[in-house]
A protein has these predicted regions:
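Non-catalytic terminal extensions that flank enzyme cores
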Residues: 1-64, 85-87, 187-188, 195, ...
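N-terminal catalytic cores of NTP/NDP-binding nucleotidyl/phosphoryl-transfer enzymes
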Residues: 11-19, 27-108, 223-256
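Surface-exposed charge patches
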Residues: 21, 78, 109, 137, ...
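Secondary-structure transition/capping motifs at alpha-helix termini
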Residues: 25, 78-86, 110-119, 246, ...
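Proline- and acidic/polar-enriched loop/turn elements at helix boundaries
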Residues: 34-35, 92, 123-124, 151-152
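Active-site-proximal, well-structured secondary-structure segments within enzyme catalytic domains
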Residues: 48-51, 134, 158
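Active-site cores that bind ATP or allylic diphosphates and position pyrophosphate for catalysis
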Residues: 64, 89, 93-95, 101, ...
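A glycine-rich helix N-cap at a beta->alpha junction
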Residues: 103-129, 135-138, 143-146
Length: 312
């Protein structure tokens, strides 16, 4: 686990200070924007981005927003405004189980009600599924990912603990062609839910458990609210998130402290895909802030859904 104590003494405007420093260093002066999200080749054909920075508010459309989300909304939109940038409204719809168009509409209404305009920059993670599939294949091809046929319980048991290393999967070192074939079979719907997952190949002895070969793709034979039955495999959020940021040319990926331990994996994904020529610099950087906690206030999507459904 990370020690968050250093965050408590960090100035409240530390993200603003980071942005000012990045701009003074001219980190984004040659950053190109292809007019829409895309890979390295797409943006290379574009012009220099007129947006000095790009941020995003990335809710998952699996419930109603609560007051806790307002902090992230204000932070991302106001920072973009103050630094002559753009804030994207992105729906992280990578898990089809509980996501619906009703929540998409509700979230858009809430953001508008707060007075913010995403100016045509509304994006959906599901629009990037084709790229994410190719990205996962690229990682397998370069020896940085594999298909694991262990059960979920076996994977959990072999992950290790905070004080003991994990164990390599028996499938980890099978040849690349074997894993590519299995992944294509997963895509074609030839395997059942839970029978296998694609995992990043990093380090099962890492002191950061999030780097012990995390899953990046799983099988879910569920209809997606946007893509229908086109896909039966879906990317894990922690794999999809950095890719979405990079495709959208986000410069500052601002999230709550709970994702601090995930930052090394966020960077790992981007660096590997840059090595494979799918992404290019400047890559987005993740920055964390403390989440909003209030007493006597509902700060849970699940609880809000219960209140709405039961007409409270």
């Amino acid at each position: 686990m990370s020690d968050h104590s250093h965050k408590e003494n960090t100035p409240s405007n530390f993200i603003r200070a980071i942005i000012e420093k990045n701009l003074a260093q001219n980190l984004y002066v040659n950053k190109k924007w292809g007019g829409s999200p895309g890979d390295a080749k797409h943006h290379d054909k574009g012009n220099v981005d007129i947006a000095k920075i790009r941020t995003r508010f990335p809710p998952e459309p699996n419930g109603y927003l609560h007051i806790g989300h307002a902090k992230s909304i204000f932070l991302n939109f106001e920072l973009a405004k103050d630094f002559n940038g753009v804030c994207h409204l992105r729906f992280d719809d990578t898990n089809p189980e509980k996501e619906t168009e009703e929540y998409v509409k509700s979230i858009k209404d809430n953001v508008s009600w707060l007075g913010f305009d995403w100016s045509g920059h509304e994006y959906h993670a599901s629009n990037y599924f084709d790229f994410m599939f190719e990205a996962a294949k690229s990682l397998i091809s370069s020896g940085h990912a594999y298909v694991d046929q262990q059960s979920a319980d076996e994977i959990k048991e072999n992950r290790g603990t905070l004080t003991s290393p994990g164990k390599n999967s028996p499938w980890r070192d099978y040849d690349i062609g074997y894993h590519l074939n299995l992944f294509n079979e997963m895509r074609e719907g030839k395997h059942k839910d839970g029978s296998m997952v694609v995992r990043a190949k990093i380090d099962m002895a890492s002191p950061n458990i999030n780097l012990r070969d995390p899953a990046i793709y799983r099988i879910k034979n569920i209809q997606h609210h946007s893509t229908g039955n086109k896909w039966c495999i879906y990317p894990m959020y922690t794999f999809a998130h950095p890719i979405e940021d990079a495709l959208e040319r986000v410069t500052h990926s601002i999230c709550t402290l709970e994702f601090e331990d995930q930052r090394p994996f966020y960077d790992w994904v981007l660096e590997r895909l840059k090595e494979n020529s799918l992404l290019d610099d400047p890559l987005p950087k993740q920055h964390e802030f403390a989440r909003l906690n209030l007493t006597y206030v509902v700060l849970s999507k699940r609880r809000l859904i219960e209140l709405v459904e039961n007409k409270f």
